[in-house]
Amino acid sequence: MRECISIHVGQAGVQIGNACWELYCLEHGIQPDGQMPSDKTIGGGDDSFNTFFSETGAGKHVPRAVFVDLEPTVIDEVRTGTYRQLFHPEQLITGKEDAANNYARGHYTIGKEIIDLVLDRIRKLADQCTGLQGFLVFHSFGGGTGSGFTSLLMERLSVDYGKKSKLEFSIYPAPQVSTAVVEPYNSILTTHTTLEHSDCAFMVDNEAIYDICRRNLDIERPTYTNLNRLISQIVSSITASLRFDGALNVDLTEFQTNLVPYPRIHFPLATYAPVISAEKAYHEQLTVAEITNACFEPANQMVKCDPRHGKYMACCLLYRGDVVPKDVNAAIATIKTKRTIQFVDWCPTGFKVGINYQPPTVVPGGDLARVQRAVCMLSNTTAIAEAWARLDHKFDLMYAKRAFVHWYVGEGMEEGEFSEAREDMAALEKDYEEVGADSAEGDDEGEEY
């Protein structure tokens, strides 16, 4: 089997974890107590879901997941919530005092007290796997635990499980709204530390998701639950190929092979369609062509940036539901002719496609309409450098005045780490710039496509 272990770090990671496991349980017909009623077993003997769940002798299905937070309140909600019986108590690990939005606390002082316990738990999960494929790490960039503890964990996972792939789902600080003043510091420190340990990082920015909820789902004031449910649909689409059997199946390592041209350039942009409320879905057809086209609308992306200003290096389309290859090929052909999609000149227009016959599941009482088919597009585009540039600019404004730096130094960091991290980010921006630059000396013949 190709098992995956999910690790949810900090408040954002844990709350997205709740939404994801809720959805997985619905998709696989697993009840909140971990039982799978025999009449619900889809198609009988389909055990692909064992990549995400392990089965006990008593027929209970336990998620292969660890929830970690340096303070107890968020995970206490899991301990008392609907799914309290789903998780093994030792999978929910909490500390006593939080990281206070401080990378240094998550990475050095508070984080190191709990790291061995976490690794021990992960080791137990890994030992239950026959062929561990890799780790999915969920966290935010802005928080102290999400940034500091995650980067510590990634370093240690690289040591313990060197060759296993590590994928991140990261909540990137939104351009306009912020939950902490020091987000730019934490984000840049964590990106710098994690860059060499992560194989692929799917970024999601809250503001982009807010806008999608407002615009497509007509939710006037989206809550984190609304956001997380939408994020969980995307995560579910990305992992569906590991959990169900399909026509064109894609596994974790296959993503990286197709999406990551250079080790450092591993930040694909996720786009999901159709995001539509039940009232609207009733009046629309949502053909394969339509949803494929929607993926190339900047409005449907999970990070605010404009791919029309950048170039694509790779593109993965993951369909699920009632989709046949003929429709997909037609849709892609149309897009190639109509859209102004620029690929870098060293990469011929390659679209990788995955198809899963399991239609998207919706959470009862959720915001999304039940649809026949959906698509999640993962594209590696140079446009995401805009997001880095935005963050770097904010970092520079604060760091020029050395604002808030004493909190980090007080927890045992050195000021040199800031400048080192910032230089690494500058190098990353430069990498993106160079990848997008034409390999030929002439710049004028690039306009034809």
From Swiss-Prot:
Its cofactor is Mg(2+). Pfam families: Tubulin (PF00091), Tubulin_C (PF03953). Tubulin is the major constituent of microtubules, a cylinder consisting of laterally associated linear protofilaments composed of alpha- and beta-tubulin heterodimers. Microtubules grow by the addition of GTP-tubulin dimers to the microtubule end, where a stabilizing cap forms. Below the cap, tubulin dimers are in GDP-bound state, owing to GTPase activity of alpha-tubulin. Mg(2+) binds at E71. Belongs to the tubulin family. GO terms for biological process: microtubule cytoskeleton organization; mitotic cell cycle. Its EC number is 3.6.5.-. Its main location: cytoplasm. This is Tubulin alpha-1C chain. It is an enzyme of class 3 (hydrolase). It comes from the Eukaryota. GO terms for molecular function: GTP binding; hydrolase activity; metal ion binding; structural constituent of cytoskeleton. It comes from Rattus norvegicus. The modification 3'-nitrotyrosine is found at Y282, Y449. It is found in: Cytoplasm, Cytoskeleton. The active site is at E254. A motif (MREC motif) lies at residues 1-4. The MREC motif may be critical for tubulin autoregulation. The lineage of its organism: Eukaryota, Metazoa, Chordata, Craniata, Vertebrata.
